[in-house]
Amino acid sequence: MRGYLNSNYKEVKRSINELDPSISSNLLNPDAIFANNEMSLEDIEVYGFDYDYTLAFYSKHLHTLIFNTARDILINEHRYPKEIQRYEYDPNFAIRGLHYDVHKALLMKIDSFHYIQLGTVYRGLNVVPDSEVIEMYEGSHVPLEQMSDFYGKSSEGNTMKQFMDIFSLPEMTLLCCVNEYFLKNNIDYEPVHLYKDVKEAIRDVHVKGILYRAVEADIERYICYGERTQAVLSKLSNHGKKMFLITNSPSSFVNKGMNFIVGKDWRDLFDVVIVQADKPNFFNDKRRPFRKVAERGILLWDKIHHLEKGQTYKQGNLFEFLKLTGWRGSKVLYFGDHIYSDLADLTLKHGWRTGAIIPELKSEIEIMNTSHYIKTMAWLQGLTGLLERMQVYRDAESQMVLQDWIKERQETRDLTKTMFNRQFGSIFRTDHNPTYFLRRLSRFADIYMESLSSLLNYDLHHTFYPKRTPLQHELPVCSEQQYANTFRIPLGRETAPIK
C-alpha cells in the first residue's frame, strides 16, 4: 500500500512541476478594482471620500513618528521604565486586522469562523507555542461574546480588540514591545492597564495635535505626492460628478495636505467639505449640528441651512447631511480605509455604495503572481486532495505515510504564510479560510482596491462583477481561470482609462 500511495504522490508532484506556462501569463492586475457586490459606476452620481489613507497617503516615516511619540509619552507621562526607549518601530512586524486579547496580552490572527490561526499568537515579540494557546483557550476557537464589538473595539464583555486601520500598526508594535520588556525583566504588570495606557498614548499623539503639527511642519517628508489622486478628482469633476469629503482630521491639517496633493484650488473640486466629523459617531448621532469653519479655524455660531461649495464645516451628523444635500442611497459611493468607522454604517443603515482602500493589496497580489507562490499553492492544493482521497486507507503503514503528508502540508502552509509576513502572514487568509478582516471587508465594501488611482483604469460606465466561486456543494463547471486560459485573457487587465 505504501507503494501505491507514493506513486500517487509522485504523480501529483510531477503534474505540479509541469504546470501549463499559460498560468503565468494569466496573472492578477495589482491595479484592478475587485468587487464583492455587483455595482455599476453609471449609477453613481455622488462620490465621497475619507482623507487619511484615501486621498492622502503617508510615507513610512509617519508610523515611526507615531511609535516614538507614544513610547515617549508612556515614559514621560505614565512613568514607564526609560529602558523601553531602546525599542524602535519595526514596519515588518504587525499586519492590519489582528486581534489583541486585552486580558492575556496576546496579539493574534483570527479567521472568519473565530478560530485562532496557530503559529500567529504573540506574547511580546515571541510566538506562543500552539499547545499553550490551546490550553489557554480550551482549543483555538474564540466565543462570540469574547470577540470585539461591532466597531472592533474592546468593550464590556468583549476581551478582544481588533486593529483595523493603518494607523494602528504602530500601536500593535508598541504594545508588543512593552510587553516584551516586562516579560524579559520579570516585571509583574496588569495587561489591562498596559493596553489602556498605550491606547491613551496613541490617542494623545492625534488628539493633542502632535501628529498634525509634525506633518504640517514637514509635509514633503510625511505625505506622498498625490498626482494620481489629483487626476482621479479632476476626471470625476470633468464628468459632472458631485464630490464631498468627510474626515476626522482637523481643517488646517487637511488644507495643507490637499494644497500639497491637489493644489490651492482643491476646494473647487468638492461640493461639501466636513472636518473633525468624529466618525463613526457622525453616522449615528443626530444631536450634533454643523458649524462653519471660517478663516484661521474660527468657528461660527450661525445656524447652517445650506452646505455651501468652497466652505468647510466641522462635526455635524449624517442625518442633517442627507437632509441638506438630498444625496441618498445607491447613487452615492463613499471611499475609506477603515472598514468599520468609514463603511459599515453607510452600507448597513443608509444603502450607500462603499469602496475600501486597501494599500496592502498591491504587494500581496505581486507575491501571488510569482511562480514560486503559484507552484507552492498548487502543490498545497494537490497534497490536500491526496489526503482527502487516501484517508480511507486505515492500516498502520498507510497511516504513517499520511502523517508524513500532514506534516508536509503544514510546512507548506507555513511557507506560504511567511511569503507575506513572517509573523502573521496575509491580511486576507488564515491558511485555507478567509481572515476575520476579509469577512468584514466582504460584508461592508462593495468594491475594494489598492488606491483611488485604480479608478483611472475604468470608464465611468463600467460595471464591476464579483467572481462566482462555487459553493462547497456546487460543481465547478467552468472557473474564471479556466475561461481565461481557454481564450488567453489576462485576468483583471481589461481596463480602459477614463476619458
From Swiss-Prot:
Substrate binds at K199, E200, A201, I202, R203, D204, V205, H206, V207. SUPFAM superfamilies: HAD-like. Binds 1 Mg(2+) ion per subunit. Its cofactor is Mg(2+). The active site is at D50 (nucleophile), D52 (proton donor). CDD domains: HAD_cN-II. It comes from the Eukaryota. It holds the Pfam family 5_nucleotid. Its EC number is 3.1.3.-. One of its GO terms (molecular function) is metal ion binding. Keywords: Hydrolase, Magnesium, Metal-binding. Mg(2+) binds at D50, D52, D337. NCBIfam families: HAD-IG-Ncltidse. Belongs to the 5'(3')-deoxyribonucleotidase family. This is 5'-nucleotidase domain-containing protein 3.
